[in-house]
Amino acid sequence: MNILLVSQCEKRALSETRRILDQFAERRGERTWQTPITQAGLDTLRRLLKKSARRNTAVACHWIRGRDHSELLWIVGDASRFNAQGAVPTNRTCRDILRKEDENDWHSAEDIRLLTVMAALFHDIGKASQAFQAKLRNRGKPMADAYRHEWVSLRLFEAFVGPGSSDEDWLRRLADKRETGDAWLSQLARDDRQSAPPGPFQKSRLPPLAQAVGWLIVSHHRLPNGDHRGSASLARLPAPIQSQWCGARDADAKEKAACWQFPHGLPFASAHWRARTALCAQSMLERPGLLARGPALLHDSYVMHVSRLILMLADHHYSSLPADSRLGDPNFPLHANTDRDSGKLKQRLDEHLLGVALHSRKLAGTLPRLERQLPRLARHKGFTRRVEQPRFRWQDKAYDCAMACREQAMEHGFFGLNLASTGCGKTLANGRILYALADPQRGARFSIALGLRSLTLQTGQAYRERLGLGDDDLAILVGGSAARELFEKQQERLERSGSESAQELLAENSHVHFAGTLEDGPLREWLGRNSAGNRLLQAPILACTIDHLMPASESLRGGHQIAPLLRLMTSDLVLDEVDDFDIDDLPALSRLVHWAGLFGSRVLLSSATLPPALVQGLFEAYRSGREIFQRHRGAPGRATEIRCAWFDEFSSQSSAHGAVTSFSEAHATFVAQRLAKLEQLPPRRQAQLCTVHAAGEARPALCRELAGQMNTWMADLHRCHHTEHQGRRISFGLLRLANIEPLIELAQAILAQGAPEGLHVHLCVYHSRHPLLVRSAIERQLDELLKRSDDDAAALFARPTLAKALQASTERDHLFVVLASPVAEVGRDHDYDWAIVEPSSMRSIIQLAGRIRRHRSGFSGEANLYLLSRNIRSLEGQNPAFQRPGFETPDFPLDSHDLHDLLDPALLARIDASPRIVEPFPLFPRSRLVDLEHRRLRALMLADDPPSSLLGVPLWWQTPASLSGALQTSQPFRAGAKERCYALLPDEDDEERLHFSRYEEGTWSNQDNLLRNLDLTYGPRIQTWGTVNYREELVAMAGREDLDLRQCAMRYGEVRLRENTQGWSYHPYLGFKKYN
């Protein structure tokens, strides 16, 4: 192809880009180059330009398509030097005549700026205490203060304001520069006294505006967090906040007293600080309506949390800078911090307060412009081109529907639901929908948040391969770097073998990428030093595990919250497979959705099995947040009418809703239409209940009994659902157990028992307690064999892994069985012939059924899903039985634990999403398994008659709960038992020996005393399959990566295990099991 390159660089950037461009193209002028070039060459050129780009870089690349047509491919550097088509302006001026960039829709920007600057001027005055100053000068081990400095700062601010004062009183005193006395210090409420003084936020202690400033002061490091006693105490926030909510610790009387003594004075003695506070106070007095709005500010989530974000970011940034002698009084005796490397005193206290205030003011002006300055993806043909395959043409209708409501979504927000069935291409459709909603000239920015690491990697890979997105367009963030590297190495092996998808033509994948730059200042500098935060914020499209975004609403410590919150404020959000999260994680998920609405994001939920209560609860979370956003950023006085849309493979529709009632009606109508269409399709899965005869026995005996019954059921299922080729018959089956402990014991029993005459069983044990390297190898083999399609018999039998297994025995019938934990339900694109399931919930049954004939049509008419009538917890006599995983609790019990009593026989004839997406009326939660799930979701998500012990999700926006960390602490995200990192490490002297080791505080310690071997015996006609030898995999990986064997094990051999004082048992094929 023929390209034209235009450079608008200046200064040193011009000579640098000339040097690079001269290597690839011929000059056609002083700033113009032209050349024929391949796609690979063009990619290399762009990478080199981006690598050397600086502030004055600006290069546009045009593809000359014909005599009268050219197309802009990309811009590297400052896109403002070109227009949307890549043209260069005729004339330029440095004068900002239109002042267009100064315009924004932030009605509260000035209130936020004043609040933040005032809080910044007081945020660390508590560091003037004798205790803190002594700590700065003590080179020994750091010791926490008896009272944290931000609490002391709040008490000092409270004393200055004075009990009973109005906001006008304390602001006038502060605005009077002549007021330099400290008589007000006698009003200081010291928490070390015998009788504790009232909290600063209790009635008559602080006037309304001062309360808002005081909360910013006390929360600038972490949210106050203390005991809550249900909704009544949450509704009283912030009144209950006391010193213990803010990190006070037990200490002797002398240590406590030192926190309230100020022998070197306070920042009030600094003339520079005093002048700046007077100026800020005067500005607050002159701000029209600010004092009148004071009572509402503290309970305004948008104002308070944007102000807190600015204050935290300014504090983080300025604390990282060297001392600045230009700020504050020379020789001021108090200090705020020390140099991290040398330990010497660094910033003076008045200087620090003035510096944070200065950068708070700058950031308050930067934030409204931030969203316009970040990189976006525009005119990307991968998102806009029409689909050729009939199966996926529904995506075009979804794209058109989203594009039709673009204007309304920009003005009123967007809440969408993608309910398309599995295998219909929801992943790419989600991106197309949000791309259609974006301004076509500016382009799209969105985040795809998923619950599983494996799903995140697969989603990112799908976007890169099918849409041609590069590393600068799409960022993939997952929890573990080792897991990501293993995934990428697997993809590289596939590419070397020619298995990757064929590359599309450039014409189909070309797009404009405006590599925007953050303006100079604290935000850019802070992000420049924080590469993880930079990646999170900069990429136009982000595919990440939801853990990367959760700190936006969940983190109690401010530093962890900054980058995710900025991402949420500047991009739209896809929540993929929302109902895969545990019910205990839904409150945190709802808080994230509420904040997405609060900060102006558009939200798309994607799942085929969304229950009505979950949908209604998340819509209400979004609506309540968007309503606040509209007050501050929308047209004044206009009602909130959120544009909602529903998409599936049959239709797409949209409508506006300002209340959950009308939304719920529209959702029910769409779901009813969807079910009517689904019922016209032939069934692919049918279930059958299997009565278990093993109740009341100890688990080892129970598993032996269950293994015998499993053999019979597996043989029956194989007989009805197999693939035959050249006289041999194979089938792929899944045995799903709820928990790993009984799973391993059942695996031992099945292997010891063997298989009946005429059958050969190949058993793979798959769960999360394998070393990472082993689990990755198992998943690689499963991915290869379980990628199925119609009429794939010959290709299936020709696969090397399968052919090798068949050659090893003479039996006609071979069963390849995966015995798995719930990790098999989601995250992998596997296609089984049949399954046997230990029930936990209707949700898990439906999810697992989706793995049967996942990508194949047709159905034999015989049941291909067997459900155990009782689960193992029930057989052991435990109550509640359907929990961990499951929905049963002491507050929500079931009368029976037998599926014969809990499932309607009509459900078995056709296993699909219907029981989940339609809520029966009335509900019978004690006698029906699916009704129990709907009841629990209603109680949690809608606060519909919840038990007294349950905190309903709506409390987050119905009370001032966001002013504390109470709900984040009582309803944490992924609150499972604490896990530690272990690995099997080769001995430093004898690499044949492996040591069980634990990683703590940067070092590995030997834990061989906690590990025992797990016995394994084999019966006739059975063998393990899909399993790998840990040491062989380790040696191969170390060779490929040129790593020392021990280093390789440290990186790729980790396994995360919960605390267990009894230790662990291990077998390479079975994984880790608690020793008992």
From Swiss-Prot:
Pfam families: Cas3-like_C, Cas3-like_C_2, Cas3_HD, Cas3_I-F_Cas2. Its EC number is 3.1.-.-, 3.6.4.-. Disruption phenotype: Infection with phage DSM3 inhibits biofilm formation; disrupting this gene restores biofilm formation upon infection with DMS3 infection. Normal biofilm formation in the absence of phage infection. Decreased production of crRNA in the presence or absence of phage. Disruption of the entire Y.pestis-subtype CRISPR region disrupts crRNA production but does not alter phage resistance (possibly OLNs PA14_33350 to PA14_33310, plus the flanking CRISPR loci), indicating this CRISPR is not involved in phage resistance. GO terms for biological process: defense response to virus. Residues 102-318 form the HD Cas3-type domain. A motif (DEAD box) lies at residues 576-579. The keyword Lyase does not apply. One of its GO terms (molecular function) is ATP binding. It comes from the Bacteria. Keywords: Antiviral defense, ATP-binding, Helicase, Hydrolase, Magnesium, Metal-binding, Nucleotide-binding. InterPro entries: Cas3-like_C (IPR048824), Cas3-like_dom (IPR054712), Cas3_I-F_Cas2 (IPR048823), CRISPR-assoc_Cas3_HD (IPR006483), CRISPR-assoc_Cas3_HD_sf (IPR038257), CRISPR-assoc_Cas3_yers (IPR013395), P-loop_NTPase (IPR027417). Mg(2+) binds at D124, H220. SUPFAM superfamilies: P-loop containing nucleoside triphosphate hydrolases (SSF52540). In the N-terminal section; belongs to the CRISPR-associated nuclease Cas3-HD family. In the central section; belongs to the CRISPR-associated helicase Cas3 family. Interacts with Cas1. CRISPR (clustered regularly interspaced short palindromic repeat), is an adaptive immune system that provides protection against mobile genetic elements (viruses, transposable elements and conjugative plasmids). CRISPR clusters contain sequences complementary to antecedent mobile elements and target invading nucleic acids. CRISPR clusters are transcribed and processed into CRISPR RNA (crRNA). Cas3 plus Cascade participate in CRISPR interference, the third stage of CRISPR immunity (Potential). In this bacteria Y.pestis-subtype CRISPRs do not confer resistance to phage DSM3 or MP22, but instead are required for DMS3-dependent inhibition of biofilm formation and possibly motility. This is CRISPR-associated nuclease/helicase Cas3 subtype I-F/YPEST.
